[in-house]
Design a protein with these regions (language model features):
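A short, N-terminal "cap"/entry segment at the start of jelly-roll beta-barrel domains
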Residues: 1-23, 30-31, 36-37, 102-114
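A short hydrophobic beta-strand segment most commonly corresponding to one strand
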Residues: 73, 86-103
């Protein structure tokens, strides 16, 4: 469970792998579920890799379709959010540099209202 998103499965691997300069997480989003808020990082760049399923991702004002094995780079200071399609969405998220999440991230509930 991720803070504020009880339907999202979130597994962080950064500490378990003792990563010093990057971060890694796995996220499983149930079918039709939209992450409840958008977020941005002040310094961290992220790459989202779809490992199963599909859906859509909103990057600033652009909405893109996601399919299995798509990879999307999101630079710092860019708002992002995602939603699962009918088969759900499983993603790996790689971020660099590793930062204190509380000090680097801003979030906004309802950022992608559609």
């Amino acid at each position: 469970m991720f803070d504020g998103a009880p339907d999202l499965e979130f597994r962080a691997a950064t500490k378990a792998l003792e990563l010093e300069h990057s971060a890694l997480s796995y996220q499983r989003v149930p079918p039709g579920y939209r992450f409840p808020y958008g977020h941005t990082h002040r310094q961290q760049e992220e790459v989202y890799v779809v490992v199963r399923g599909g859906g859509r991702m909103k990057i600033d004002d652009e909405v893109i379709e996601l399919e299995e094995w798509d990879a999307v780079r999101v630079p710092p200071c860019t708002w992002r959010g995602y939603e699962a399609g009918p088969d759900g969405l499983e993603i790996l998220v790689i971020g660099a540099p590793t930062l204190d999440m509380r000090g680097d991230v801003d979030g906004e509930r309802g950022w992608w209202p559609e």
